Amino acid sequence: MPAPMDSLAAFATDKLAALESQSLRRRLRPTRRTDGVCVERGGRRLVSFSCNDYLGLSHHPAVKAAAAAAIESEGLGAGASRLVTGDNPLLATLERRLAALKGAEAACVFGSGYLANLGIIPTFMGAGDIVLVDELAHACIWGGARLSGAQVISFRHNDVDDLTGKLAAARGSARRALVATDGVFSMDGDIAPLDDISRTAQAWDAWLLVDDAHGLGVVGGGVGVGALFPSARIDLSMGTLSKALGAYGAYVCAAQPVIDLIKSRTRTVVYTTALPPAVAAGALAALDIIITEPKRVAAPRLRARRLTRSLGLPTAESAIVPIVLGDAETALAAAADLERQGLLAVAIRPPTVPANTARLRIACSALHTESQIDDLAAALQPWMQA
């Protein structure tokens, strides 16, 4: 007989104590976003540099009005999965607009970015296949790859030579191959070399999935990272509605038969309630703003570059600037110091980032003023020199 298990509560208590000892325990902190930049937390108003609402559209009057009007006419929730009665016409309209923006034949929306990659990859990959994943790709890509049952192979970050070598070693025995990467990496803000990755994937008869969650609305004139690499063949262009669009959910753009199969067989589409119509309406209004306001689209990167210039860091490629501090304790101390100064920059710790690379992940918004960026740079300087 095996030894009796601890109670579930005792097991959890031990796990939490171990995390606490490593400064890795997470705690929720109630936070209200009062506008596109500032938050209320612990009774204080803080300028936030930890929100992915890159264009400030979650609080844009046109976006809120569109969502409110949809609630009035369509109700709050979808009521069922899309294959039952949840396929509100606003969802198809949003999919057509996303596909047109991305230059794809069709699109499918999802409940979240995590659900998207958790569902997409197992739809196309399985036992006998290989999935090659950038080592710094988002957790949802890793989750979908592992869930698929395919052999999952990590390649060094943005290292096309390493990708080529690993494809060469494994491709011959595999039925199908998929290369999966972030477009803009969520914790570092750098951009994948998609032209070279695409050429390598094609040379080894592999499909390419790109997660453009942090590119849409920010890079490539708002179209996303694919617009920076027009020659790249991206078979599955996935992204979110929850970052620059200021809404919630996700999408994937691809060829029409690919999308048809996703809508028929992907478990995170078939077996879950559809996105609320109001979310689709708000996202549609946000797309209009991205298309018609190029200065707003350019602003987050300009703010990020002002910050990197002030701190003597490499020029920002996106709206994200990592301030890598090393151990978790230092990152937590730096975050607390900034919060005392009225600035919110949440510490990011393992396992979200690799060991010894705990950091403050700075997310710049179109609504940040230059003086707010300068205040942040001044507050960060002592930690850069420590």
From Swiss-Prot:
Substrate binds at residues 26, 138, 352. Pfam families: Aminotran_1_2. GO terms for molecular function: 8-amino-7-oxononanoate synthase activity; pyridoxal phosphate binding. Its EC number is 2.3.1.47. GO terms for biological process: biotin biosynthetic process. The modification N6-(pyridoxal phosphate)lysine is found at residue 243. Belongs to the class-II pyridoxal-phosphate-dependent aminotransferase family. BioF subfamily. Catalyzes the decarboxylative condensation of pimeloyl-[acyl-carrier protein] and L-alanine to produce 8-amino-7-oxononanoate (AON), [acyl-carrier protein], and carbon dioxide. Homodimer. This is Putative 8-amino-7-oxononanoate synthase. The lineage of its organism: Bacteria, Pseudomonadati, Pseudomonadota, Alphaproteobacteria, Caulobacterales.
